[in-house]
Design a protein with these regions (language model features):
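Active-site-proximal or metal-binding-adjacent scaffold patches in catalytic folds
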Residues: 1
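Zinc-dependent metallopeptidase catalytic helix centered on the HExxH motif
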Residues: 4-89
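Short hydrophobic/aromatic-rich motifs at helix boundaries and adjacent loops
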Residues: 26-28, 96-103, 133-137, 149-150
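A short secondary-structure junction motif
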Residues: 33, 37, 66, 88-96, ...
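Short, charged low-complexity intrinsically disordered segments located at boundaries
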Residues: 64, 86-95, 158-164, 178
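Amphipathic alpha-helical substructures
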Residues: 71, 107-110, 114-179
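The feature captures the short pre-catalytic strand/loop hairpin that immediately precedes
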Residues: 92-114
Length: 179
């Protein structure tokens, strides 16, 4: 992915889903550049939370934690992710998807996009953080991520999948359930 003018707009720099302030949003956008994540994830299945955003938000959290301390990172990242995920699972349309399907398309898309945002920007970073704890901490997770991003790519399907991540961690989907 490439930075463009949209990354420097007031709206983008104040997006609290990407960081606690403009500087942290810039960290988020630069992390996208670092990993080249836009090309590493298959975005065709929007129903799963595994995406460039989840890993980017997690990585931003790690940088912010190192820079501003664990308390700041907990308050401005982990606690906010958890609150959003808790609210997600209480959401009427998540609990009653048939009602969502009955809405007019424009409303359905707006709600679906909002719900997808929570899964990608909040649920996935929490799952990666849980994986970090289960594999033995930050250094272990750093080794796993380094291995995943330096892996031999399959030219037929070069994307990093959630199953690739789980396999590298020695975990299952059930291990990362947040309930």
């Amino acid at each position: 992915s490439l930075l463009d003018e949209a990354d420097f707009t007031a709206d983008n720099l104040s997006d609290t889903g990407k960081g606690g302030g403009a500087g942290e949003v810039m960290i988020h956008e630069l992390v996208h550049q670092w990993w080249g994540l836009g090309n590493m994830f298959d975005a065709s299945d929007e129903s799963i939370p595994w995406s460039a955003e989840g890993l980017t938000v997690y990585t931003t959290y790690r940088i912010v934690k190192e820079r501003y301390g664990p308390s700041y990172a907990q308050e401005h990242y982990v606690d906010q992710w958890q609150q959003a995920v808790d609210n997600y699972y209480l959401n009427f349309y998540v609990r009653n998807p048939d009602y969502l399907e009955a809405l007019p398309e424009e409303e359905r898309l707006e709600i679906s996009n909002s719900l997808r945002y929570v899964r990608q920007y909040c649920e996935m970073p929490l799952k990666i953080l849980k994986a970090e704890q289960l594999v033995g901490g930050e250094e272990a997770m750093d080794r796993i991520l380094r291995g995943l991003f330096n892996r031999e790519l399959d030219p037929m399907y070069p994307y990093l999948t959630y199953q690739d991540f789980l396999n590298a961690c020695g975990l299952t989907e059930e291990d990362l359930n947040l309930a």
